[in-house]
Regions:
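Glycine-rich phosphate/pyrophosphate-handling loop used in enzymes and phosphotransfer proteins
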Residues: 1-217, 221-261
Length: 261
């Protein structure tokens, strides 16, 4: 009779063999340059090009600041009250390295990259985690959803919800009309492009009253999209609105980054 330890070792060996075969047939690849990697991460060449956002940065929009002073600092835009949201947290400064990874996640149907970005987003979320009552994605119109295959921000929102046990409402915000892609427009056009494009799902008007909501998005560029969403949420009784994104562009073009590759 085969002993239990022998069976256990056999299963362990079979698992290792199966895993090795998978790595040969489907090797792990860097999400940016597609080089083969040893684990689910960026390759060494891409890793050194990533620009993580660290303090000091604006307390509201997360813009990196050229200052040695600590504390809750505000950038020029936030001193003027540009945004409707209360705080934005982004993991990376947007550059070519992170752009390639987000592009594959967003447009190349590589939905599995949601799990890859998740570990970075969870760490960034820590400072506000206890204050968040609900998580929602940026909605996309059904035409774009059909073309893209999925809403990448919904994948992220659900994964974060699962890991944190914070509730997620996928359809709290609705995209009621198809709009031109924001990336093709200048700043002022972006604002007008989104005017009246979003609405609150009437089924959730009471449950969200007074709640603090976190919107999950992939990239913060001018802030037009999340700003419009935050305005609608607050207009309908939401408490505070937080934003969590994978990356953000720099509004201060004079800010010196370690590299710009």
């Amino acid at each position: 009779m085969t002993s239990k330890p022998s069976r256990s070792r056999a299963r362990e060996l079979a698992t290792k063999v199966f895993s090795a075969l998978l790595n040969i047939l489907y090797p792990r690849r860097c999400p940016s340059c597609r080089a083969i990697t040893k684990d689910d991460s960026f390759c060494p060449a891409c890793w050194v090009r990533l620009l993580f956002i660290e303090n000091p940065c604006c307390f509201v929009c997360g813009e990196p600041l050229d200052t040695r002073y600590g504390g809750d600092l505000l950038c020029a835009a936030c001193l003027k009250g540009r945004y409707n949201f209360d705080r934005l947290l982004s993991v990376f400064i947007y550059n070519k390295t992170i752009a390639r990874a987000i592009y594959r996640f967003k447009f190349k149907r590589q939905a599995f990259l949601s799990k890859f970005f998740l570990k970075f987003l969870l760490k960034k979320l820590e400072p506000i985690k206890s204050k968040v009552d609900l998580i929602i994605p940026i909605p996309i119109h059904r035409k774009r959803l059909k073309w893209r295959g999925y809403n990448q921000t919904l994948l992220l929102a659900r994964d974060i919800s699962r890991e944190t046990s914070i509730g997620c409402i996928p359809d709290l915000l609705l995209k009621n009309r198809h709009t031109v892609a924001q990336t093709t427009l200048r700043f002022r056009k972006r604002k007008s492009n989104l005017r009246s494009a979003f609405e609150i799902n009437p089924n959730y008007l009471e449950p969200i009253r007074g709640k603090n909501i976190m919107i999950v998005d992939d990239i913060f560029t001018t802030g037009s999209t999340v700003n419009e969403c935050a305005k609608i949420l607050k207009k309908n009784g939401v408490g505070r609105v937080f934003i969590l994104t994978i990356a953000r562009t720099l509004l201060n073009k004079k800010y010196r980054t370690p590299n710009s590759l």
